Amino acid sequence: MAREYPLERYRNIGIMAHIDAGKTTTTERILYYTGKSYKIGEVHDGAATMDWMEQEQERGITITSAATTTFWTAEDATKDPMSDPETLREGQPKHRINIIDTPGHVDFTIEVERSLRVLDGAVAVFDGVAGVEPQSETVWRQADKYKVPRMCFINKLDRTGADFYYCVQSIIDRLGATPLVLYLPIGAESDLQGVVDLVNMRGIVWQAEDLGAKYEFVEIPADLADKAAEYREKLVETAVEQDDDAMEAYLETGEAPDAATLKRLIRKGTMDRAFVPVLCGSAFKNKGVQPLLDAVVDYMPSPLDVPAIKGVLPDTDTEETRPSSDDEPFSALAFKIMNDPFVGSLTFTRIYSGKLSKGQVLNSVKDKKEKIGRMLLMHSNNREDIDEAFAGDIVAIAGMKDTTTGDTLCDPANPIILERMEFPDPVIELSVEPKTKADQEKMGVALNRLAAEDPSFRVSTDHESGQTIIKGMGELHLDILVDRMKREFKVEANVGAPQVAYRESLAREVEVTYTHKKQSGGSGQFGEAKVVVTPGERGQGIIFEDEIKGGNIPREYIPSVEKGMREQAESGYLVGFPIIDFTIRLIDGKYHDVDSSTVAFEITGRGAMREAAERGGIKLLEPIMKVEVVTPEDYLGDVIGDLNSRRGQIQGTDSRGNAQAVEAFVPLANMFGYVNELRSFTQGRAQYTMQFSHYDEVPANVAQEVKEKLA
């Protein structure tokens, strides 16, 4: 089976947005117009094709990012833009679009992060009433981190209170981005009829009857002529800045470049992230989706337009790039694992170079071989078996044994490890206990499966109580995982109240000499270590420095000292939470020819850490959340008063449309159940988002309470 679509006709894009901006609906429409799903699934009917987990359909939010492959033919820019829509697409090459739908809820930013890692471009969807919302900012920053070229679709312009121009301004104010407006809305709110296409200077109007597949080109309405001319001029001026020759020609003649040249310039600026093209419409009312697809083909990068992926060679640690080409050695990144009710475990994989057929590949991170048996192309919830996949493809591989999220798959003869993804540490935890003996075994399997799928979800056992503790990014995150355990794995469990994931930290530098000796006939145990333990910067982790001179502790025992100290730090000192962010300097020690061993030095390390904690003093740290509440003016005082009562530090307020946004740092311990209280004192009119910001010291009186509660 040869490659069907050349690489330059691939588009790997993500659709990202704030919760409720209409992202899944937009994806649904894209699938409908590209002929992938024959009937439109509505989110509020619980029938959207991309949201295929039962809970997503019940809650109406997207939790997992499903990858879907679809196809589209764009217009021919050299033909008369007013000719019939069919004629404009005739004879044009088909493009293959892989869409990754991402969740917009802040508890699932991990999903967004891992999708952005494998995309080449992204479409940010905004709500036409609210403009840029907190989660949109988070996602935007994540996209900046991965240098993803993107464009914006201002959606829901059929809603009462929708304001396209306010949204464009909010892209400048809140994201610090440079919007390049390509379309203006015709009509507003319930009277939205279509859009003005500024590249071709024409109106596009949808005939409402048949789900928006039919539209026609019209002259630009007279009442929009001035506005269209003004925005067209801005568009041309920004576009010609991308190319010196075009700029010169424009300055000399004052004539705008033709449509084909304009598109080329806009494409260049989009890829260089000089600006973000802005489109508009209403996905729900089927208006503006075809121009969005055209823009994806015209302006979003193909795998050849983005820098080649970098990696390191496992043996030598030298850096190497793998260009997007079928002739390069095979390399791919496993970016998501899902359990499929029909196929079992599926590993979603982005192929960066080479081709993949059935047989063996190497997981270079784990250094294990994996067998490729069954490969699938996913169309939201139905699937197509394939025998071969190429550079640029996003495929699902069934039945992999050892591969987890973020692992590299490659050709065993040419191993490489691609850049890994970073996953945040969880900030909230709760205990789960199986209801019956039968549930006990199933629960272990279920939790391991869920943890393999989601790297921001961790499972551990409390050594003292024997309870199983699950940790995640927020209440909703853990809620959904417990719910999935019940539905998918039929495990009934009692769930404890959510607990804060506190941390411990050293109060001051301390020098400790610890000797472990056990003599009792025969071979004994002996180890001595002298260490200096110093509190570090927040977020530095544990740093171990070996400063042993002259072999006072033999080389082979030094890792044991480090291991013992790290393990002891993990189990904490004050109330059993990990001690974080400090530096250990191992400066001296002693050993015995017969009695010393790796085990003896590990015990020495543990003892040294215990003593360092005891003598250096321990402070309790708590996770501080960045909270943003958007509330009507009337409740502003109540909201601020309430946040203050939760030990919050107000950072500022600013007006957003007709509402006020309050930003504050609040300890997570004081935010449980906030959603219900906020709802009750604002009559459900305020909403909030929160995300982890940093760890900070717990005030003495609160620390005392925590100790008593947890002791």
Swiss-Prot record:
Protein name per UniProt: Elongation factor G
Organism (species): Erythrobacter litoralis (strain HTCC2594)
Cross-referenced SUPFAM superfamilies: EF-G C-terminal domain-like, P-loop containing nucleoside triphosphate hydrolases, Ribosomal protein S5 domain 2-like, Translation proteins
Record's keyword terms, sorted: Cytoplasm, Elongation factor, GTP-binding, Nucleotide-binding, Protein biosynthesis
Entries under InterPro entries matching the protein: EF-G-like_DII (IPR053905), EFG_II (IPR041095), EFG_III (IPR009022), EFG_III/V (IPR035647), EFG_IV (IPR047872), EFG_V (IPR035649), EFG_V-like (IPR000640), G_TR_CS (IPR031157)
Domain of life: Bacteria
tr-type G domain segment(s): 8-304
GO biological process, one term: ribosome disassembly
Stored Pfam families: EF-G_D2, EFG_C, EFG_III, EFG_IV, GTP_EFTU
Positions contributing to GTP binding: 17-24, 101-105, 155-158
